[in-house]
């Protein structure tokens, strides 16, 4: 089989990984910690998200563009979370702060950061980075860098 055949007929399309974020989020059906299911992302998805996270900064030398890493990670998590659906209206809607006011609707990446505690968010982010080989200790990337 040639490399082209392998590319056109991959063994799998996407990998998934389930991760429990802690004991605070309990599945009402099982009574066990709820799990989030993450999937791998494509290079195109990553590039599209990265492009949306470019911000312009100013320094003494003028203006320059850089990636807002916090926004990039949150958007990647939303895009790659298969279950629960982090783009759902229910997830993105918060109760009004004042009686009689309308519910507050925010973007999925903002809702994710508001709903999860720091350790939960960190577990989800770590699982995402491991699944997509974006962790800092990736041996494949280390080998490429060394050569």
What does each model-found stretch correspond to?
Residues 13-23, 34:
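Mixed-charge (Asp/Glu-Lys/Arg
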Residues 21-25, 40-42:
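Short, flexible loop/turn elements at secondary-structure junctions
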Residues 4, 8, 22, 78-80, ...:
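A subset of signal/propeptide-processing and intrinsically disordered low-complexity segments
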Residues 1-16, 27:
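Extended acidic low-complexity intrinsically disordered regions
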Residues 30-147:
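Short, surface-exposed, charged amphipathic helix/loop patches that serve as local interaction elements
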């Amino acid at each position: 089989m040639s490399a082209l055949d392998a590319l056109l007929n991959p063994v799998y399309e996407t990998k998934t990984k389930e991760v429990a974020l802690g004991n605070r989020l309990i599945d009402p059906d099982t009574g066990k910690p709820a799990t989030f299911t993450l999937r791998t992302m494509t290079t195109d998805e990553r590039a599209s998200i990265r492009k949306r996270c470019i911000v312009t900064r100013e320094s003494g030398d003028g203006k320059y563009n850089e990636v807002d890493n916090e926004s990039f990670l949150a958007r990647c998590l939303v895009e790659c979370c298969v279950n629960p659906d982090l783009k759902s209206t229910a997830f993105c809607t918060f109760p009004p702060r004042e009686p009689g006011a309308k519910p507050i609707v925010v973007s999925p990446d903002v809702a994710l950061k508001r709903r999860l505690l720091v350790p939960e968010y960190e577990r989800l982010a770590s699982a995402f980075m491991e699944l997509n080989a974006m962790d800092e200790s990736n041996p494949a990337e280390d080998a490429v860098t060394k050569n």
